[in-house]
Amino acid sequence: MRYAPHASRYSLFALAVSATLLPGAGWAANGDLAGARKPPSVACSWNREAALSYEERRLDTPLPFSGANVVTHDQTPLAERIVKGAGFDGFEPAFAKRLCAADGRTPVSSYAKALKLVTEEGRALWRAAVDRAQGRRAIPAGALPASDDRMLYWTRLYMTRTLRQWAPSFHLGKAQAQALQWRFERASRGQLDIDLPRRYAADGSRYRRMIISGFDVFTLGTPGTANTGLRNGNPSGATALALDGREFRLADGSLLRIEAYLLPVSYDPFNRGMQEDTLGPWFRPGPRRVDASITISQGGANQFWLEAWNGRFHGSSAGNDGIVYCPADSALPNYVLPLGSVTNPGTAPISLRGSGCNINPPRRWLGYDSASRWRQNLPAQLSKASLPVRQLLAADTWRGIERPPGATSQAAEGFDVTWHTNYDFFPDCANPRTENVPTNGVMNAMPDPSLVLPPNRRICARNGGGGDYLSNESAYRNTVLRDAFRLEIPAGHIHVPVMNNYYTGVPASGGGARNDNAISDARYEAYRSAIVAQTRALLVGVGNALAQGAQAD
């Protein structure tokens, strides 16, 4: 969605009802419009015993508040501290009031009206998060910085919990309730707000249209167990919020327009086709077709990785919902979990066909069914990125980036950038033995081409360059969709440096005191600012390569 440079085009949805003033009507003593017709309402209530999702059960979990490495002792749940600290604590109460007011009545009298409401509320939450990140939403003194991304994730969970507990008097079937959750998830991630322009701007400048994705926070620990992982942010999510709707003038005078959305760190939404349903409409032919599609996630320490190869394989790490798609003792490409399997205690059972060790994009976008029967190269085991690597490495995107305390790199400033050409594979797809092709190790320059070894079609992927988790999955689905549409555009993945670095009390990390009870500190915020700034420079570099007609490496 495009935003005005200094003022938001959007505001929170007001709880107001319009009325037509009929002849002779006037204002009643209670402030209502006398003679006006009020919308019909139905009874409603709350089911506080409704089973919460695995992620929602973290809402009451605090950071460590006693013991070693704790300076402050705040026992407030981390989610509450983040949401209040960002000024987002009004969203869930307002949402609850729209669903069911204090008098036990609601104008949401049907499933269709409920679907409309959750779409509105989800989009309002996304817009508010983008506005905050881009300086269009007031931030009180002492609040978390505008660049913080975490309030969107935790506010969303407060709202999905409320929606789950809503009990309208009209019949709301299980499938309908799930559809409401799905729509809210998509709307609150910016997936319904993408709005690419036509070819030319009002001033005659040509547009270069780019879609980027970021991720939720992740590695949040076990619900109910205090841990420092809860305070994690995600620099890819912060980048998405900072850049959604932004335009940048490129070297040739054209305009780069960036539209952004967020993805969850759980396998089921990917298996349902969330990413393809977001990107697919913009990959189709038409006057607003995308020119570049870049997925972004958090990778390793102090380096940007431009991934060369994305693998079809799922690893054995759980998503934020606790579900694992490829158990370690069954980790072969053709393994599929039986429906109803529970992969971790307290998590939802497997409910989607094709949930297993290989990624299966949806038939509606892929053009064929890859989930019913495993076929080695339908789709490909390793999908190649099409990034203008040579131009990005030559752009010196580290220039002008203030290096955070404790960060190291070969470059004079900022972080190193490397073409990440490694991958792991099964030589025999039915045998668990794997082999590795290492990366080239060259920073801030193109490597010798002889160090870049492409895979062959006889092997099966074990890891893409960025591993086997959901960042690799987003990258794989993006490039497979590119190929399904036979697009020749920049499409690839940027792994950004790890952001979740707090003071440790030692000089090498900046010398600040370690406090595992703190929700933020200056070192953490310095990492976020530096990573977002250099990621922006890389994306503008992709835009300049587009303008120059550069070829992918």
Q: How would you describe each model-predicted region?
A:
Residues 2-13:
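Bacterial N-terminal signal peptides that target proteins for export
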Residues 504:
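An aromatic- and histidine-rich active-site surface loop
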Residues 11-22:
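Bacterial N-terminal signal peptides
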Residues 466-471, 475:
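Substrate-gating cap/lid alpha-helix
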Residues 24-28:
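Sec/Tat signal peptide C-region and signal peptidase I cleavage site
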Residues 30-461, 478-479, 483-488, 497-499, ...:
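N-terminal catalytic or cofactor-binding beta/alpha core of small enzyme domains
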